[in-house]
A protein has these predicted regions:
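Conserved SAM-binding motif I beta-strand of class I
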Residues: 44-49
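Class I S-adenosyl-L-methionine
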Residues: 2-5, 80, 97-220
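S-adenosyl-L-methionine
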Residues: 56-84
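Conserved alpha-helix/loop element of class I SAM-dependent methyltransferases that forms part
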Residues: 3-19
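Conserved SAM/SAH-binding beta-strand->alpha-helix loop
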Residues: 51-53
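Short SAM/SAH-binding signature in class I
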Residues: 86-93
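Glycine-rich SAM-binding Motif I of class I
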Residues: 30, 34
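Conserved class I S-adenosyl-L-methionine
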Residues: 19-28
Length: 220
């Protein structure tokens, strides 16, 4: 049986290393974990969701695909109620502000034994800024297209280093070259220009700095 996995979730799976123990936060119907297990990629999966309905659906789906005994299910707000015996944590389909809240409430994740795979639906620059200011480093990030929209998936490690500049928060050097990168850059620039031009004197200084930095980068 084919597992109905979006391009976004497939991209997340692409960052999982063989044999890793995976925690899927906000698992929805559980397809990411099911895919990783049926493909022999993950060793085990922890699946959590804040709502009982999706979690019950994920349990049924795991039974349907024959991997129920390899997944532990947990009703949890973020990572508050999950076991800590995993290697990589996946958060997909949430806003950047929600991810910031989850990570802020889990200081125990700040260890080099954990990796994060994050896929934002919105407010990605906010998430990148938070990560870089709180000891996390984006090791790699990839742009993908799902339907009509462009998204990114980032692989994050615990490695305190210099905070990202405003321009890097919008278009980081960790982005991998692929067929969608140019379109993503144009989308970022257009969005920044809209913010700056519409707000004029009241424009967010961070956005102004980011746009100026990226334009200067074009000239080098």
């Amino acid at each position: 049986m084919k597992i109905p996995l979006s391009n976004r979730l497939l991209a997340c799976c692409g960052f999982i290393k063989p044999g890793e123990r995976v925690a899927d936060i906000g698992c929805d119907h559980g397809y990411l974990g099911i895919y990783l297990l049926t493909k022999g990629i993950a060793r085990s999966v922890i699946a959590s969701d804040i709502n009982q309905g999706p979690l019950a659906s994920a349990v049924r789906n795991s039974e349907k695909y024959g991997v129920r005994n390899q997944i532990s299910f947990h009703l949890s707000d973020g990572v508050n109620n999950i076991p800590r015996d995993f290697d990589v944590l996946v958060c997909a389909g949430m806003g950047g502000d929600t991810m910031v809240s989850i990570l802020s409430n889990a200081p125990w994740l700040k260890q080099d034994r954990y990796r994060l795979i994050l896929q934002c639906q919105s407010k990605t620059p906010m998430l990148r800024q938070y990560l870089s200011q709180n000891g996390w480093q984006i090791a790699q990030e990839v742009v993908l297209k799902d339907g009509k929209f462009l998204y990114t998936v980032m692989a994050v490690i615990w490695k305190p280093s210099e905070a990202l500049s405003p321009g890097e928060c919008y278009f980081p050097s960790a982005l991998l070259e692929n067929e969608h990168l140019s379109a993503y850059y144009k989308w970022v620039i257009t969005g920044l220009e809209t913010i700056v031009n519409n707000q004029k004197e009241q424009a967010n200084p961070f956005a102004v700095q980011a746009l100026d930095e990226l334009r200067k980068r074009e000239q080098t």
